[in-house]
Amino acid sequence: MTQLSRFLYGGDYNPDQWPEETWSKDIHVFKKADINSATINIFSWALLEPREGKYNFSKLDKVVQQLSDANFDIVMGTATAAMPAWMFKKYPDIARVDYQDRRHVFGQRHNFCPNSSNYQRLAGELVKQLVERYKDNKHIVVWHINNEYGGNCYCENCQNAFRKWLKNKYKTVEGLNKAWNMNVWSHTIYDWDEIVVPNELGDVWGIEGSETIVAGLSIDYLRFQSESMQNLFKMEKKIIKKYDPETPVTTNFHGLPNKMVDYQKWAKGQDIISYDSYPTYDAPAYKAAFLYDLMRSLKHQPFMLMESAPSQVNWQPYSPLKRPGQMEATEFQAVAHGADTVQFFQLKQAVGGSEKFHSAVIAHSQRTDTRVFKELADLGKKLKNAGPTILGSKTKAKVAIVFDWSNFWSYEYVDGITQDLNYVDSILDYYRQFYERNIPTDIIGVDDDFSNYDLVVAPVLYMVKHGLDKKINDYVENGGNFVTTYMSGMVNSSDNVYLGGYPGPLKEVTGIWVEESDAVVPGQKIKVLMNGKDYDTGLICNLIHPNDAKILATYASEFYAGTPAVTENQYGKGRAWYIGTRLEHQGLTQLFNHIIFETGVESLVCDSHKLEITKRVTEDGKELYFVLNMSNEERTLPSKFTGYEDILTGEKAHKDMKGWDVQVLRN
């Protein structure tokens, strides 16, 4: 990470939506809340370039000057995320064609074709103008490329580029036919121009990314689209670095996470990871924690919380107000898991457009005596006090959960067994086990180094690409501990099944093979017997044959009662567990009590009293414990922290933690 010079507190500011005479007053209000940064120019292309090649930076010049004079740090957008109307009129090929084969017209955003040479040229020219103009302004601390990349395109530009991409990957049509198993349903091709993009008029149906005839085609197209958008990012970054090689460059990741963009592939090109976080009102706290751990783990460095909501959002089906104290707790949750910034959308609430009811620092009332503003000012004061200590500190984890976009795509393309396969939910089942025990956890990809961890958990590792099995075997053989589950080791990187019984190349390390998989229908409960107690399970039940593995749990109902449900296998110096069914939370907790004991993985605090507790370590080795009450019920601080200092207030830690209370403690 290119180190930020201070902890950023601020967010998206759109002064181009407001009269110039209001800007200085806005900045004065921001300063009252100890806000020190603003993200600008995200969607200003139409103002900057009203006609092709005719640029007008007069308004942006004034905005930059006023923010610089106020000593604000500026996150400068490149404005390429939403195109002006004239571009659609002059260059129709710029507009993306969606999954239903409809070419978009002017409107919304995420509306460009990533393989349009006209878009690439015009975006590049705008970025060049922008960077040449502002490259020497030292108040610009981050360049923010585009915004929340997404929106796959299925146009002729993309189809032609996809054919070239496939030719480069497979070399011959014979190689492609073999990889995609194209003898199914007379799909064999004899020329590259016979390949068509997988939209609803062809081999796919249902929600985008959910149903396909030829999984190899559909997965490769998602890889291609993610790479195409990444190439746009790389193009803009190259231009920025030519004129400003020092200032860090990012683009904001988003979603739960965004399924269509492989952030692990993108991470190497980011100087710093940034993320937009908008948990729904009913999302459990561990879900947001997982996403923050994923963002931190992409580069194993602190990240930017680029966007979040002071209170309500405008686009979710239901958006209750954040309760008193809840905003501070949710912002500090991001910091606890690795964020070095707290930034909002938006700093000033719009009067029009679809986001006019999205909460802001300056609300429509334009008052500073409101509940939300007072809470924002209190948060600003605490970040001003604690930010210098927190900035740059890191998380050290000995547990890793494997999350992989190719598995995300292929797992949810599975046609058969059950329609209820959900990759993220399956991962969260296992993340929750460590979250509730306050065990620091990294979220890693299949290409990351496993040897850094005492325990690696790879739920639903459906796709095992070439070489991954050897990597897992070597890790376990050398003393590592590995957990995998049902729907693992089933297919190769083209989504073709491994023969010889499941879990395919993972049979050796797990010491089992799976004969069949039963779907558990809605409303049905299957019992699993473990340590003399029955536990409910669902979704899928693997019928397991142990080879070398010992049995930890058996099914207690259905015709496969008495057969293994969970196994443990000694392999070299390490062990591998196989969980053949989706145990409900109580049963999974019982199982992980055993696994965690056996592996020696330690919790930060044993008597957590239902508090979320994480730890960051500063460069000089000081430990910072983030203690968060992510509920509206009163909790008790663990006795371990008696006498610690709360760096948010400078006072001693307090024992009774009211709802949404936060303490950041050091000894």
From Swiss-Prot:
This enzyme's EC code(s): 3.2.1.23
Effect of pH on activity: Optimum pH is 6.0 for both lactose and ONPG hydrolysis, but lactose hydrolysis activity is more sensitive to changes in pH than ONPG hydrolysis activity.
Cellular component terms (Gene Ontology): beta-galactosidase complex
Keyword Cytoplasm on entry: no
Temperature notes for this entry: Optimum temperature is 37 degrees Celsius for both lactose and ONPG hydrolysis. Retains 16.5% of activity for ONPG hydrolysis and 11.2% of activity for lactose hydrolysis at 4 degrees Celsius. Stable at or below 25 degrees Celsius, but loses 50% of its activity after 1 hour at 37 degrees Celsius and is inactivated after only 40 minutes at 45 degrees Celsius. Can hydrolyze 73% of lactose in milk in 30 hours at 10 degrees Celsius.
Domain of life where this protein originates: Bacteria
Example of a GO biological process term: galactose metabolic process
Positions of substrate binding: 109, 147, 315, 355-358
Binding site for Zn(2+): 113, 153, 155, 158
Active site: 148 (proton donor), 307 (nucleophile)
Protein keywords: Glycosidase, Hydrolase, Metal-binding, Zinc
Protein name: Beta-galactosidase LacZ
Annotated source species: Lactobacillus acidophilus (strain ATCC 700396 / NCK56 / N2 / NCFM)
Biotechnology comment: Has potential for lactose removal from dairy products at refrigerated temperatures.
Entry GO MF terms: beta-galactosidase activity; metal ion binding
Annotated family: Belongs to the glycosyl hydrolase 42 family.
Catalytic activity: Hydrolysis of terminal non-reducing beta-D-galactose residues in beta-D-galactosides
Function: Catalyzes the hydrolysis of lactose to its constituent monosaccharides glucose and galactose.
Top-level EC class: hydrolase
